[in-house]
Amino acid sequence: MGVPTMDQQWLNTYREEIGGFSNTIHSFAQGEIARKDYKGISGGFGSYAQRDAAKHMLRLRLPGGRVTPERLHFMAQAVQQYHVPFLKLTTCEAIQMHDLTPDEVPAIMEAAIPCGIITRGGGGDNPRNIQASPLTGVQPGEAFDVMPWAEAATEYLLSICRDIHMPRKLKVAFCNGVDDCVHTAFRDMGFVAQPDGTFKLYIAGGLGGGWRMGILAAESLPAEDVLYYIRGMITTFCQHGNYQNRAKARTRFMQETLGPDELRRVFLENVAAAKADESLKLHLTPAAITKTGTGTLDDPRAIAQKQPGLYAVAYHPIGGRLIPEKLVQLDNLLSTIPGCECRVAPNETLYIINLTADEAAAVLDATADGAKTLFETSVACIGASICQQGVRDSQSVLQRAVQAVREANIPDGALPKVCISGCTSSCSGHQAAAIGFQGTVKAVPGGKPAPAFAIFLGGSDALGHAHLGDTIGTVYEEQLPALLVELGQAAAAAGQNWQTWSAADPDAVNSIIAKYV
């Protein structure tokens, strides 16, 4: 008996569910279902109504952020057929289509199935898109390619998603052992590849309200046993998660109710019980990349792969907003390049991998409209102009900040990548950023509260050294670009990059921020 997968029966049921959801979305459009009730249904299908309830978002689940040529071609066709205005690369390595009509959402869900895109469980109290280091399989220095485990875990979780009822969502990430951009240190489950072929596992971490660093649950977890540990977490979460208070329903709150040591004990006990089901044992071998290349390339966006002669190209559309024309352009170009594929990264960067030097040069030309500095790779959630939950329009703020920094001629490196969230949910990961912003309001003397952002300083997601930043005040939204410009000017005047300057002279950093809070 093999590992449970999304077999034909599962897919047939999924198609039937899409038909039922089509009726639901149209009932909502006709005012027959309240917004809150609709959200509880639509999230399970990876779709939400936007702030303008006539428009909808659909989240395309991409295990490990992997965009195969078939998936890229499907999306390129879909944006043309349905006139999709824009797409959003997400911090969970998915791609969202926005401003869709009630007719378009179920139609795209159905059309996505043949290329392996399943939107089921893309929202709501479900296992979310499983993340993997975006350059896994090609990154120099990695322990091993973790993509097969991310994909196997996705198959398993989707196969059982109808049979489990968790208190809230579950986020799982796999790190290849080079960097921790997927935030394994503070996920519900974070697997870190080790040089001996095992995984280190952290559990019950998370950003947002009541944030917690994950607790170490296993030092050398056999790779073949990954699904037993996932099953053990689901059992533990269902046993001890909070079904009464959604604000305290994520796995991280089990650290409070049970305590870290007891949580670890209960979890490992449930893992041991799960091992009675021998069908969950994995036997995976990463696919070998046989493509070779010649020539060299020197460009800050071109990354040499561990395969000699091959490169990955980084493309970061500002704010992670991808225009449909660019998607179509990339599909047309990459369809002529054998062996390449795309990867969505948690910082909203799109990597195009397995390129020769000449192919990489062509991709660099096609993506020249993206971020040109570290600061321009800053992360912002979709923001309050679209998101129902949002408090501030993080996308607008980022666009204004990028423009201000460009006009001030701040040199590359003087400012770090910043992360901007429109609310407390930390969708941008602002709590783990060198500089993070969280949407809020701030009192105005003698007036009404004004749009503002809480400032987080000093966070890091560095592998083995991850920690969360400190809140140091609140800046009015209209002054946020000026604050960043002044910080960048100070670092540049010192002749240092942000990391060096902020570490060497924290008093100077704080004195500048103090003028704005």
Regions found by a protein language model. Give the residues of each.
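Mobile "lid/hinge" segments at catalytic clefts and subdomain interfaces of large enzymes
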Residues: 2-4, 8, 166-265, 433-496
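Long hydrophobic segments that form regular secondary structure
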Residues: 304-311, 318-344, 484-486, 490-493, ...
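Small-residue-enriched alpha-helical segments and adjacent helix-cap loops
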Residues: 2-4, 29-33, 55-198, 228, ...
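Short, flexible, solvent-exposed loop/turn segments with mixed acidic/basic and small polar residues
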Residues: 46-52, 83-89, 239-244, 301-307, ...
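Flexible, glycine/charged-enriched surface loops at secondary-structure junctions
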Residues: 85-89, 160-167, 238-255, 262, ...
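Short amphipathic beta-strand starts and helix->beta connectors
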Residues: 41-47, 73-84, 203, 235-238, ...
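N-terminal basic/disordered segments at the start of proteins
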Residues: 1-71, 179-180, 191, 294-310
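Terminal amphipathic helices with adjacent charged low-complexity linkers/tails
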Residues: 99, 103-107, 111-116, 238-302, ...
